[in-house]
Curated annotation (Swiss-Prot):
One of its GO terms (biological process) is lipid glycosylation. Binds 1 Mn(2+) ion per subunit. Residues 1-6 are cytoplasmic. Its main location: membrane. Glycans are attached at residue 75. The chain crosses the membrane at residues 7-23. Its cofactor is Mn(2+). One of its GO terms (cellular component) is Golgi apparatus. The gene is GLT6D1. This is Glycosyltransferase 6 domain-containing protein 1. It comes from Bos taurus. GO terms for molecular function: glycosyltransferase activity; hexosyltransferase activity. Pfam families: Glyco_transf_6.
């Protein structure tokens, strides 16, 4: 009897091992390799791969078909956080939401997190399928710098609400407007946006923080790219790490009576913690400037605040 029981346990153990091996192989088969979708030779006119081998996404460098084939099988949700307070809420929010509803991750589940300082009537938008929105009222004191308030509020809501609801999270400024499809090519663990203006300049001229005592300090001769703070993303945990590091940097600088911008702190963060994917200037082009030949396809335009 004892022998039979041992044999039964052995058979059960082998069955579990085979089952585990089957699902392990299946998951490996479903894993998307960079070479499956990224075609850097498609754009010889621009930088398509960083020195740490992260892809720089331009139109013409990715296979939308392969990406769609992979992500359509995945059960994921993406969050898009936008901060619309004060005078920026009325003239920009409706344009932002309408364009994002139309062009951002069309056909995939998206939760729009709208962060406002007062609860006003939201614009009437006919939401596409798989879309929903949530409004968070910003309670942080407004005497702080606007970026500090934004990132402090974002970090708080990632911890309290967002991290349990989405797999990817992006933070954008309300002055942006989507002009063409922004799809699953932007998804990644830690996604940075190249600055449209500074991408075409020499690194020596980048406006990094040069005061050694600042937490945002990057020495002369160092640095990779200049990143734009208007569009950042990744997993909720990575976005939370970025926000917390920025806030810690601000506190450090205040103690030394220094004041460095959010974008400079962001560039220091990406200098130390290399992004796993970079978005080309096509994903945030300044609408006041005519795009150069390299920017063939403007996906997102940054509107000028001077117009309002």
């Amino acid at each position: 009897m004892n022998c039979k029981r041992k044999m039964l346990l052995l058979i059960q153990g082998l069955s579990l091992l085979l089952l585990f091996d089957h699902y392990s192989r299946k998951n490996q088969e479903e894993e998307l390799e960079l070479s499956d979708w990224f075609k850097p030779r498609g754009r010889p006119d621009v930088i398509t791969t960083t020195s740490w081998l992260a892809p720089v996404v331009w139109e013409g460098t990715f296979s939308r078909k392969m990406l769609e084939k992979h992500y359509r099988r995945q059960n994921f949700t993406t969050g898009l956080a936008v901060f619309a307070t004060g005078r920026l809420a009325d003239p920009y929010l409706e344009l932002f939401l309408n364009s994002a509803n139309k062009y951002f991750l069309t056909g995939y589940r998206v939760i729009f997190y709208i962060m406002m300082d007062t609860f006003i009537k939201l614009p009437q938008i006919k939401w596409e399928p798989l879309r929903q929105f949530k409004v968070f009222i910003v309670t942080e004191s407004r005497w702080w710098d606007n970026d500090v308030v934004r990132m402090k509020s974002l970090a708080k809501h990632i911890i309290w609400d967002i991290q349990g609801e989405v797999d990817f999270l992006f933070s954008m400024t309300v002055t942006q407007i989507f002009q063409n499809n922004v799809g699953v090519e932007v998804l990644g663990e830690l996604v940075a946006q190249l600055h449209g203006w500074w991408y075409f300049k020499d690194r020596a001229s980048f406006p990094y923080e040069r005061r050694p005592k600042s937490a945002a300090y990057i020495p002369f001769g160092q640095g990779d790219f200049y990143y734009d703070g208007a569009f950042v993303g990744g997993t909720p945990q990575e976005v939370l790490n970025l926000a917390e590091e920025y806030l810690n940097g601000v506190i450090h600088d205040l103690g030394l009576r220094l004041n460095s911008s959010y974008e400079k702190h962001l560039n220091k963060y990406f200098f130390l913690r290399k992004p796993t994917k970079l978005l080309s200037p096509e994903y945030n082009w300044d609408a006041d400037f005519y795009p150069p030949p390299q920017v063939q396809y403007v996906k997102v335009a940054q509107q000028s605040k001077r117009r309002h």
